[in-house]
Curated annotation (Swiss-Prot):
Gene that this sequence comes from: pyurf
Transit peptide: 1-40
Further comment: PIGY is derived from the same bicistronic transcript that encodes these 2 different proteins.
HAMAP family to which the protein is assigned, alphabetical: UPF0434
Entry-linked InterPro entries: Trm112-like (IPR005651)
Keywords, comma-separated and alphabetical: Mitochondrion, Transit peptide
GO cellular component: mitochondrion
SUPFAM superfamilies: Trm112p-like
Protein name per the record: Protein preY, mitochondrial
Pfam families on file: Trm112p
Protein family per UniProt: Belongs to the PREY family.
Primary localization class, coarse: mitochondrion
Domain called TRM112: residue spans: 56-102
Length: 122
């Protein structure tokens, strides 16, 4: 037991020396810890495990499109996160959004705007 205490003190001393060398002013770098929302914590005991596979819409306040950095909206009927500005939809698999741009699908067809110069008169 004494060996464990001695090792603990030695380890703490080594860590403190390393921190002092890394931050000579004594100020440690600020680290911000933000808890992430976990739907399992908020689940009532009578809910089935099947519900854990659904997307939690409260996560939308933390998620943005990786391409445009704009907010997304959740489309429950298709189980996708939609970026209306770019016209793409990110799939949600087992309650986890797949935010890889290569896996997103286009939801708007390429529309060519009609200008008055190209209209034909009959």
């Amino acid at each position: 037991m004494l060996a464990v205490r001695a090792w603990g003190r030695t380890y703490n001393t080594l860590v403190q020396r390393k921190l002092n060398a890394a931050c000579p002013t004594g100020a440690l770098p600020a680290v911000t810890l933000r808890p992430l929302h976990c739907s399992l914590v908020a689940r009532s005991p009578e809910q089935s495990l099947k519900d854990s596979k659904t997307f939690d819409p409260t996560l939308l306040q933390f998620l943005v499109c990786p391409l445009s950095r704009k907010s997304l909206r959740y489309e429950e009927s298709t189980n996708e996160l939609i970026n209306d500005e770019l016209g793409i939809a990110y799939p949600i698999v087992d309650g986890i959004p797949n935010m890889i741009p290569q896996d997103a699908r286009m939801i708007h067809k390429d529309r060519k705007p009609e200008s008055p110069d190209t209209e034909q008169t009959t």
